[in-house]
From Swiss-Prot:
This is Tetraacyldisaccharide 4'-kinase. Pathway: Glycolipid biosynthesis; lipid IV(A) biosynthesis; lipid IV(A) from (3R)-3-hydroxytetradecanoyl-[acyl-carrier-protein] and UDP-N-acetyl-alpha-D-glucosamine: step 6/6. Transfers the gamma-phosphate of ATP to the 4'-position of a tetraacyldisaccharide 1-phosphate intermediate (termed DS-1-P) to form tetraacyldisaccharide 1,4'-bis-phosphate (lipid IVA). Pfam families: LpxK (PF02606). The gene is lpxK. It comes from Vibrio campbellii (strain ATCC BAA-1116). The lineage of its organism: Bacteria, Pseudomonadati, Pseudomonadota, Gammaproteobacteria, Vibrionales.
Amino acid sequence: MVEKIWFDNHPLKYLLWPLLWPLSLLFGAISKSKRQQYQSGKKQAYKAPVPVVVVGNITAGGNGKTPVVVWLVEQLQQLGYKPGVVSRGYGAKAPQYPLVLDDNTPAKHCGDEPKLIYRRTAAPVAVDPVRANAVKALLETSVDIIITDDGLQHYALERDIEFVIVDGNRRFGNESLIPLGPLREGVERLSEVDFIITNGGQAQYGEMPMSLTPSKAINLKTKQQVEVSELRDLVAFAGIGHPPRFFNTLNAMNADVKVTKGFADHQDFDRQELQALAQQGANVIMTEKDAVKCDSYAQDNWWYLPVSAQFESNDAERILNRIKEVKATYGSPSA
């Protein structure tokens, strides 16, 4: 219901407006005050000895940040850099912080997105609610550039480059701050960032278009790859910021979807619930982010659909050139 108020102009917003509007004003005042404390020097932000690139958004929910992080890591690795990724580890609880991921780290300890990034890129990944501590842990692994998955509003960590990812279809909803609207910060914040990436829809002036391109479906147990259109009688589920985006992708691929089920973002799945859901079709398909949470009990007919960020070549070049420029201003981490 909240998202209908934020994005669909639901009539209920007029009833809730007297309650939510003052709370939005309070949220905005607190957020602005926190940022000003770091800008004025009243609070000291941590400055890393290597470049820090933030990939975030100004709206609540998922807009496609993680595929952009994966793309950046892969591009930088190809250029010979040693990128590392930090995250808050939202929705997870680690035995201790900071937590540097390894092959055996479960998603419940690190979070689904950090686990996905680690698996896709093999780059060092650390999680900590205090991102500066995660950065310090990664510096011990000899990384030479840090990418933070989310954290645009985490001003306790200085950054060199800021990306904002925008849902090109839903944009900024009613353009109100939380809880009246979806905004973490006002849209004026966009004028201060380095790159505005628009995921789907129509990119506006000054924005870079980005698309999420799906590949073949991958079996959770055997790693076999098949075309999605070859899988019959699919049960599709997604625990992401906006599940309909995943279902729309499947429809565009002519997938034989019989049942869809959306879950909350970062939801800790109930094994019995998923297994019961799976009984409604011949095959199950999910997002890659969901797969890292349930691969330990996956069945032979469970599949996930990886997606990759795609940019126009000139935009990709602009992004990488900007990072190279910033990187050139830093010495080596050991200097």
